[in-house]
Amino acid sequence: MTLRVAINGFGRIGRNVVRALYESGRRAEISVVAINELADAAGMAHLLKYDTSHGRFAWDVRQEGEQLWIGNDVIRLLHERDINALPWKALDVDVVLDCTGVYGSRADGIAHLEAGARKVLFSHPGGNDLDATVVYGVNEEELRAEHRIVSNASCTTNCIIPIIKLMDDAFGIESGTVTTIHSAMHDQQVIDAYHPDLRRTRAASQSIIPVDTRLAAGITRIFPKFHDRFEAIAVRVPTINVTAIDLSVTVQKPVKAYEVNLLLQKAAQGAFHGIVDYTELPLVSTDFNHDPHSAIVDGTQTRVSGAHLIKTLVWCDNEWGFANRMLDTTLAMAAIGFR
């Protein structure tokens, strides 16, 4: 039976989820029945079809009133600010993918359920009171039918968690630091303008800008044993897509760089195929645009110091990879049933 999905928020992730659904050939498994977005219908259709990062959508897209047509599929468009007023019950929605980047609390999830959805998946980190936080490929098997309010974590958490798991299982991680080198985002300014964060008052295209990150908290949410053993910082750089993560960990077992690369390469070809990829080609960030993997290890940048300090560089398309994991987690939530 085809899963009936609604999307709340049709920004970068919401639109990429729809594109990924059609490009991945999973329309027999998932049907988008409604999209809620405060923007007007014409703008929604236009930005789905034309995308600066990912190019022109291969499918025919047209908008008729409050309906969005993709090929022969019709999707109802909504413009409702109040979650409680959304018609999820009338639309028989199985799972809501909340891609607003605004909502993420348990109360927000309950509001979607009370509106008639059977389950909710947030496209960003939520509070500790959510039923589960999933990094697909690592812990989706922990999902239970009673888990109705779930977070898909963040794009950077999805990128780094598989690598941390692999290194910890093989070498035993003592502690680590992470630096996220992230493309500019919508909460930055085109030209200097006011923002509560004074660094984000500055033009995104002209500076490398340090920003706050909760990635360390995201790591410990998946692996509680690393509480107080990981720290993270983040900078935004003047590109529009693709992120690099510099991961440094101290490990218990002595190791050489080639052993680290061999571990990650084998994982990419085996247990983590489709989630982790590995390359030693001389590539740059744009080469990973539209890559569906959560993490792409750059083996040319692996270093080991003193046999116990490992440094690796991991790439991800912070939009496309994450959108594909949203679909994976949605199907995993459905596979365990509804209660």
From Swiss-Prot:
Under InterPro entries, the record lists:
E4P_DH_bac, GlycerAld/Erythrose_P_DH, GlycerAld_3-P_DH_AS, GlycerAld_3-P_DH_cat, GlycerAld_3-P_DH_NAD(P)-bd, NAD(P)-bd_dom_sf
Q: Which CDD domains match?
A: GAPDH_C_E4PDH (cd23937), GAPDH_N_E4PDH (cd17892)
Binding-site list for substrate: S154, C155, T156, R200, T213, R214, R236
Where in or outside the cell is it found?
Cytoplasm
Output the Gene3D superfamilies linked to this UniProt entry: Dihydrodipicolinate Reductase, domain 2 (3.30.360.10), NAD(P)-binding Rossmann-like Domain (3.40.50.720)
For this protein, the record's SUPFAM superfamilies field holds: Glyceraldehyde-3-phosphate dehydrogenase-like, C-terminal domain, NAD(P)-binding Rossmann-fold domains
The primary location reported for this protein is cytoplasm
Question: Which molecular function term from Gene Ontology is one that the record holds?
Answer: NAD binding
UniProt site positions, description: Activates thiol group during catalysis? H182
Listed under subunit, the entry gives:
Homotetramer.
What's this protein's function? Catalyzes the NAD-dependent conversion of D-erythrose 4-phosphate to 4-phosphoerythronate.
Return the similarity comment: Belongs to the glyceraldehyde-3-phosphate dehydrogenase family. Epd subfamily.
The name on file for this protein is D-erythrose-4-phosphate dehydrogenase
Organism of provenance = Cronobacter sakazakii (strain ATCC BAA-894) (Enterobacter sakazakii)
Name the encoding gene, please.
epd
